[in-house]
Amino acid sequence: MVLEYADLECPYCARAHLILKELPVRRVFRHFPVTSKHPRARVLAAAAEAAALQGRFWEMHDSLLEDQAHLDQPHLWERAERLGLDIDRFERDRRSPEVEERVAHDFRTGIRAGVVTTPTQFFEGEPHPGVPGPDLIARFTS
């Protein structure tokens, strides 16, 4: 199992995602929006959590990381529609205190775990910051 802390607007997180999604390992995702560098990171995290409430977290997660050129509001709605989400519910949920708290909770747990950059993967309790390299990939799959 790999626990990953990532920012959905971070280009390094997008690179890590492309590697991790191909590996035969269970992934647990935690939001770590670095808003000082990525101003839409918290909005995108809320969108992913709103999609999760309709059972489509990973689809929204993948869509955001795999097309970072289109992370503005109109494209969020387009993604939500393409995923078959109830748009009214999606909008309500992504602005809800519960979703905001979920994202904030993930961020706080990352801080407590020592996350200082994105992406950071935890494997066997050890933090591994940055895009996974060949040695770490080999450990993930052994």
Name these PLM-found stretches.
Residues 4-6, 12, 17-22, 78-142:
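C-terminal cap of thioredoxin/glutaredoxin-like
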